[in-house]
Amino acid sequence: MRIKSFKSRAFALVSTTALLATLVVASPAHAAATGPTCDGATPVQTCTGTTSDGAAYKMMVPATFAGTVTIWSHGFGGNTTIPGVFAVDSSAQLAPNGPGQNGGSPDLIKYLTDKGVAVMGSGFSTQGWNLDEAVKTNAELIGIFKAKFTTTTKVVAWGYSMGGGITQAFAEQHPELISSAAVMNPVDAWGSQSKYFIDLLWLMKTWFDPSIKLTGYAAGAAGDMQMLGDLQKYTAILTALKAGVASGAWPTTSSASGKALQAGGIPSRSALLMIGRLAGISAQSSSFDGIVGPPGAAATAWPLAYAPALATLENIAGVLGYSLLGARDMQNKMGGTSFDNQKTDYSKQLSDEDRTVYNAAFSGNTAIAGMLQTLSPLNPDAPRIKGDAAALAKSASTMYESTGKIKVPTVMMIGQHDPVEPAGIVQRISDLYEEDFAAAKAAAKKAAQKSGAYSAPARKLQVLWSVTPKSWSKFDADGAPISIVGTPGTGHTNFTMAQYKLVIDTAIAAAANGELPWTGAQLSKVTKAKGLKIDRDTLYPWMKYYNK
């Protein structure tokens, strides 16, 4: 996603009144399409313009253009500018960014144009949850490109995070416009992704700070200030939980139910882990592998009691801002609260496997039962979210819900422990595709009984899992954990340029040949890119939304 990391210190430097005065809320632009205006430069010319929704676009076309163009969809961006914190960015994006980059990695763009491949992308007319708007923009942009560059033969769609979801939705709705797709750590359909976000936020509010508003924000800048106030409170919760991991102390802002659990001897780390398991957040993170512990007496207790909670904490910190901004953005878009958990049975969201594997970290069966009991809809201290009927109806009738169907040759890449888009999103797509592929094979065999010739169906999905090392946690001389950034297979959109090149090369090859490469040469390229694995036997849990 595109927004920068939230920095809590930024809020302390600006008064509420001053911040309110400087908030800028972006609205979708609407205008006639313009361009493309091209500079005619060589060896690569640049063309710019806007689609009919006002979205800025950019194209870079080499003089050696051989007919293939990529269309990039960028990740999540906020719709509100807050000076010093984050800004609305509607500039055109052409490819994944490297550290500190915007608009697309120059190295990656050159890598493609040197091959005779053109690149294009949009900034989109609105940010936030913009899947539906982006799909329309991309369809129009492809038409503009083909009209200008009439020798175009292949279009390859790709994107990550929000853009990964956009690319998957585009491939589902407009397979006739593209030849292949590269989908990286995609958001799930809004129904599923929003449940993941809101479950996390509601559970933290319910146990750790019931003064958090979360829903019913005011319109405009005043509501943005309320959301920022909530963000400060969530950040304070994480700070308190980190400080209390060893002692088990709960945040002082905890609800009556939370304080009762504390009085019953349940440490805050057990509640923190419970929130993670109920929402579906990984218990392994960039710093915590859940395997290696500090030397000495804590070595046994560490992986059982402490590491899962600390990993959950680190992952929550990674997804918190996206969750809150996503919830706020959708409230603006739908005109009210479009999430409802009045009928959710959270006890059913705790799997039998989690009850067993994390039993010690949960502080035992009695503690598990006690924590789940406080989440009952009958508990007045845990008020549920009641969605606004009109907002729920608008969401259901206007938001496209991705099916996960694979309609064009598609390569996917995702980290095992991405905190924003869990691996279960791609696992579900992979599982559904295996069912479709099995049905296609059965149909081919049946047809062969009549024709006498068997024509095997081609696999249309190749999943590249970004995997972790066998272990990676580190500790200082005092046994304190050392923070680690960028561990492969963890974090959000944590990919290397070599991996991006492999993914887009795979998609381009699929576009050229009509099917994905499964040769030994392809497997060698996967190995050479490092940290990736093709595995059709993975069993990552689906998002909780599908537990029906």
Residue locations for each model-derived region?
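Secretory targeting and sorting signals
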Residues: R2-A31
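C-terminal His-loop and adjacent cap/lid subdomain of alpha/beta-hydrolase
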Residues: A32-Y160, G165-K548
